[in-house]
Structures are given as structure tokens and as C-alpha cells.
Amino acid sequence: MRSVSLRGLEAEARERLDHAVYDFFAGAAEDETTMRANEAAYARIGLVPRVLRGCGAPELGVSLLGRRLETPVLVAPTAFHRLAHPDGECATARACAAAGTVMIAAMASTVPIAEIVAAGRERAPDSPAPWFQLYIQPDLDFTGAIVGRAEAAGCGALVLSADSPALGHRERDLRNAFHDLPDGLRCENMRAPGPGAVQARPRSFQFSPELSWAHMDWLRER
């Protein structure tokens, strides 16, 4: 049966995906209190229609950072899409391009950012380019190289994740012994820069409580 809602897609994913993979996508840190609170907060939001306005067909499009979007709903960054689909983030980019909205590509993508951007352009050349999520790494030279790749790929913006001074204590992942990607999958954007970058083993993510406004100044100036 074809899913017609987000809840339906979630149920279908639970049936199709490996249990540990589903828990990775569906889970959060500790007791998942914040995740449940977020869902409850969104559920309390109501859309109150205006009546007798004579406005014709509704128009959902918006202008964002100088680009036209067909919907004000963006796709947030999520890691490791190839765990769920063989084309990984490229499939997500094509879907977002077809919908006329922005995909925010995760720094922990299983496809290089240049290929993600190219996949969206191939599907819909005039669609808004993906944005790139960034975790500033302690090695600022390496971080700068990652930002340079996103710029060269044509990303429309950087989305800085500043709320992760440490890796979350994800209890579902711990129970499932989900500590790393399976063989053949890598965080492609974390490869070392240089001529041998494609062959180089990706670096591990590093989270630091040292992140401050000084890092924002560095990012703006580079």
C-alpha cells in the first residue's frame, strides 16, 4: 500500500529497514525527551484559514536567499542516506529538486557534496542548490578545506551546527552496537584534502566545547 503521509512513511521504513538502521534514523540522545517535546510543540501549531478572501489558488512559494522555492519546507540534514537507499544523498537531492525546495546536505553524507549538487541539477537545472551543513572541526585548516569543497560544488549556503559540543549519548545505537558504517560506506566529505583525497580514509568527526563566536568570525573571514 502506498504511503500518503509522513507517519505512513515512518511505518514503512520500520518494516523495510534493518532494525539498527531504523533506530539510527528515528532515534535521538538519552531518553529522547527533547525529540518528543519537539514533536509535541509542532503538533500544537494550528493553521487557521482565512475565509471569504477571494484570493484564488493558494501560493506557497517563497524567496529565500535570493532563490525561488516552491514550498517553505526545507529538508533538514541527516547523515548516512545510503543506509536507506543505494543512491544515498543523490536520491534525496533529486527528490528535493523535483519538489523545488532546498536539501541541506549533511556533513556526514555517504556521497561527496559535489555529486549531491550535481544530482539535483541533473533532475531540475533551475532548482535551488543544496545547502551544506557544517560542524567546525578543531583542525581549522581541514574545516576550511571542507567549506571550500562545498563552495566549489555550488552549495547555496552553509548551515552551521553549533549545538553539539559533544556526541550525543544515543541509547538506541548503543543497544544495537551501531558504532560505525558498514563496509563500503564512508563519510565522503571527511576525506583529507589534496590529490589523493578520493583514496584517503575519511577522518573521524570531532565535537568540541571550545566552539565560540571567534569561530564565527573565522568562518566569515575565510
Residue ranges and their predicted role:
Residues M1-L69, R170, A177-L211:
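An N-cap/entry alpha-helix motif that binds or orients negatively charged groups
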Residues E30-T33, L83-G88:
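A structural motif shared across PLP-dependent enzymes of the aminotransferase-like
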Residues T71-V73, T92-T101:
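A short, Lys/Arg-enriched amphipathic alpha-helix followed by its capping loop at the start of a domain
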Residues V73-A76, T101-A105, P130-L134, L158:
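Hydrophobic faces of well-ordered beta-strands that scaffold small-molecule active sites
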Residues A79-H81, A106-P112:
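Short glycine-enriched loops at secondary-structure junctions
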Residues F80, A93-R94, A119, R123-S127, ...:
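Alpha/beta enzyme core
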Residues S109-V111, L134-P138, S164:
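Short, acidic/turn-prone active-site loops that include or flank metal/cofactor-
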Residues I113-A119:
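Distinct, well-ordered alpha-helical segments
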